Amino acid sequence: MKPISLACGSLRYGITCHFLWYLPKWQDAEQFGYPLGVQTQISAEYSADPRVTEIEAILRKCVHCGMCLATCPTYQLLGDELDSPRGRIYQIKQVVEGHAPTVDTLRHLDRCLTCRNCETTCPSGVQYGHLIDNGRALVEERVSRGLFFRIKRGLLLTLLPHRSRIQPLVRLGQAVRGVMPQVIARSIPTAVDPGPWPEPQHGNRMLVLDGCVQPALTPMTNAAAARVLDACGVSLVSVQRAGCCGAVKFHLNQQDDALDQMRQNIDAWWPEIEKGAMGVLATASGCGVMLKDYGHALASDPVYADKAKRLSEMTMDTVEAVRSALDNLDENRLATVRSSAAAAGPIAFHPPCTLQHGQRLAGVTEGLLRRLGYTLTKVENSNLCCGSAGTYSIFQPEISGRLQSNKVAALESGNPSIIATANIGCQLHIGQGVAQSSDVPVVHWIELIDRALAGEAAGGEAGR
């Protein structure tokens, strides 16, 4: 039986799509003599580059089916297949085969949100996130960035990954927020008291990533997680020597510096891990997906490879930690949570891309919230990115703004009393969009449980 071929006229590389629906698995194609995936002829200049070795292995899994186009936010908005996963795959393919990349190549790769929705959709298991990271790094080595971009990136790299630098700026902004133009003031959350952090008292201990911007912008998130887990018999321990997870530098093509940050975090946490810490918690799903990738990022490091792999395996998102500990919650306190949840009103939940696509935890947080008695509204296209995507909203404001508007409209369509999410970037980005039309608070979902344990209603100022 021969595969049916359809030409993909919108893509500029003369690709033929082969729809292999008669095969039980895409991988079975090779058994029928059909070459599986994108075939490459690596240029001699890249023959010893480990990044290109990984790129080639990933490319071989892609069967050109085009299913990723249907779930790619930038392709949906722009309609250009070069701004789709398949289009970017073939641009990267051309680069590793020796074709000189251009400014246009860089622009199409930059427009990728790295939301990894395509990975969830892909039937072949293409690890597109690793592919785009390596592809961008290769292209940037050969295409010069503009001065304005370099200045903006330099400022972000100087500030964002360092909480000792970002916190004073945030406090200053909060102090003068009232006299700022509204469009700027909306981007600065109101200062709030995070509340007490329970003293470690349980045999079960879990480490927590403080992060870089979260202590300054949403300090209540980790404090709320500490109180909820304390009620469930788990002590949350912060190790001050640990810093940024490395995601900011890694995705801004400063991979070597990012790897150093990963090593520093491993060194900071390792004594506690050896003492029996049961896991590492990342309340921001964007940080969590980076921590879970330490094993891959440091796989070739002879000193840190094993430690990085173990740390990745120990890393938990908030929902994984709470779900595993919830059975230890006292029945009376559980009843208090359910009573508060029933009175909370409808909740709209936005699952961050890093949670549902990066960590493959789609639907898990929603299931936990429903189990505790919360009513969740229906949100159309919940699989799509809100447009935050780390620093994407800074470098691609037009696309980011359109995605933000679409997401806010979808979240508000069910008239929720509160909007919840699981990542600081999404929380702030959606909060800025919501603030333009309503006063619905946007919070991390763990704050709902924290308030419910205290017998309080949902809502409040934490999302601003």
Where are the predicted features?
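Short hydrophobic transmembrane-like helices used for membrane targeting/insertion
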Residues: 1-4, 15
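Acidic, Ala/Val/Gly-enriched low-complexity intrinsically disordered segments
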Residues: 7, 28-30
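Cysteine-centered iron-sulfur cluster-binding motifs in ferredoxin-type domains/subunits
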Residues: 56-75, 102, 106-126, 354, ...
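Iron-sulfur cluster-binding electron-transfer modules in prokaryotic oxidoreductases
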Residues: 128-464
